[in-house]
């Protein structure tokens, strides 16, 4: 069995991996995302994912597969990561409701067994429901949107306020499982090698 390391403290990403039989070692990269200033949304999430994975990979003493991810919501050309505070989350939801956005997740898989690195991007369209200010306030009061890129969790209460997903649902949660399978295959592995 290959050692699999998740370079993220995200419980949602860990749970997605566990749901497919991968029990990762979890290392938080503590990479300072503010040190990266890239205007292109696609390049930004891929660079952040790579940096997070590299920080963790450089700390490991033994070979492993190291997965780093970074997600942002792009709405009307603007990037939204995690909200700063409840007021920010409320303001975001007031601008997001009834709109469509793109959830971008950069994925980096570093193979320390073969000294190879793959960097990929998954984009999923998210159509948000029109919800009232009262619903927004109640949702934000749960605290859930404060820990999520785009201020919503598809796999939580936030799923109530998403009308449609076009593309990969697991990508919206933080990790595209089909893309991970393709990346493992490109490196010559099967997901079962990580079970």
From Swiss-Prot:
Q: List UniProt keywords, sorted A-Z.
A: Cytoplasm, Hydrolase, Nucleotide metabolism
What positions does UniProt annotate as the active site of this protein? Answer: 70 (proton acceptor)
Main location class:
cytoplasm
- Required cofactors, per record? a divalent metal cation
Cellular localisation:
Cytoplasm
Q: What EC designation does it have?
A: 3.6.1.9
Q: Which reaction does it catalyse?
A: a ribonucleoside 5'-triphosphate + H2O = a ribonucleoside 5'-phosphate + diphosphate + H(+); a 2'-deoxyribonucleoside 5'-triphosphate + H2O = a 2'-deoxyribonucleoside 5'-phosphate + diphosphate + H(+)
Indicate the enzyme's highest-level EC class.
Answer: hydrolase
What family does the entry list? Belongs to the Maf family.
Q: What protein name applies here?
A: Nucleoside triphosphate pyrophosphatase
What is the recorded function of this protein according to its Swiss-Prot or TrEMBL entry? Nucleoside triphosphate pyrophosphatase. May have a dual role in cell division arrest and in preventing the incorporation of modified nucleotides into cellular nucleic acids.
């Amino acid at each position: 069995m290959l050692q699999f390391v998740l370079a993220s403290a995200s419980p949602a990403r860990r749970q997605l991996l566990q749901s497919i039989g991968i029990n990762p070692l979890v290392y938080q990269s503590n990479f300072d995302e503010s040190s990266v200033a890239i205007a292109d949304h696609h390049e930004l999430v891929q660079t952040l994912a790579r940096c997070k994975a590299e920080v963790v990979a450089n700390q490991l003493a033994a070979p492993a597969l190291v997965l780093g991810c970074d997600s942002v919501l792009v709405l009307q050309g603007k990037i939204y990561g995690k909200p700063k505070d409840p007021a920010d989350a409320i303001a975001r939801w007031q601008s997001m409701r009834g709109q469509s956005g793109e959830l971008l997740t950069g994925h980096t898989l570093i193979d320390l067994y073969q000294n190879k690195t793959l960097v990929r991007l998954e984009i999923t369209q998210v159509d948000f429901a029109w919800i009232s200010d009262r619903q927004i306030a109640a949702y934000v009061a749960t605290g859930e949107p404060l820990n999520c890129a785009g201020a919503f969790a598809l796999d939580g209460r936030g799923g109530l306020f998403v009308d449609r997903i076009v593309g990969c649902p697991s990508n919206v949660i933080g990790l595209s499982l089909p893309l991970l399978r393709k990346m493992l295959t490109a490196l010559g592995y099967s997901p079962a090698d990580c079970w």
